[in-house]
């Protein structure tokens, strides 16, 4: 896929994901938790679109290495955030 087509597809996908998030927020009767979960899902999908379409993550001779670096960074971030939340929730329950 050439660059112009790739950028156009990425741009349209980003706009669609943004509009879907706005629609879910303004025009549905879901609970706050459901809306938040759906919007975070759209955000992660949009981040992947940005990395693949605009940042050319998988292109070039180091594309696979770059992909593994991003996956590793995501795993480390998730472990840190989830672990911190887990420890903070556990510690808070013992003080009450």
Curated annotation (Swiss-Prot):
Q: Which GO terms describe its molecular function?
A: cytochrome bo3 ubiquinol oxidase activity; oxidoreductase activity, acting on diphenols and related substances as donors, oxygen as acceptor; proton transmembrane transporter activity
A Pfam family that this protein carries is COX4_pro
Q: What's its EC?
A: 1.10.3.-
List the GO biological process terms.
aerobic electron transport chain; ATP synthesis coupled electron transport; electron transport coupled proton transport
Q: Which positions, given as ranges, span the membrane?
A: 8-28, 37-57, 68-88
* A GO cellular component entry from the record: plasma membrane
Catalytic activity, reaction form:
2 a quinol + O2 = 2 a quinone + 2 H2O
Bilayer topology term: Multi-pass membrane protein
- Where in this chain does the entry annotate a coiled-coil region? none
Q: What class of enzyme is it?
A: oxidoreductase
Q: Which UniProt keywords apply?
A: Cell membrane, Membrane, Oxidoreductase, Transmembrane, Transmembrane helix
Subcellular location per UniProt equals:
Cell membrane
What this chain does, per the entry, is described as: Catalyzes quinol oxidation with the concomitant reduction of oxygen to water.
PANTHER family with a match to the protein in the record: CYTOCHROME BO(3) UBIQUINOL OXIDASE SUBUNIT 4 (PTHR36835:SF1)
Which family does the entry's similarity section mention? Belongs to the cytochrome c oxidase bacterial subunit 4 family.
NCBIfam families xref list:
QoxD (TIGR02901)
Recorded protein name is Probable quinol oxidase subunit 4
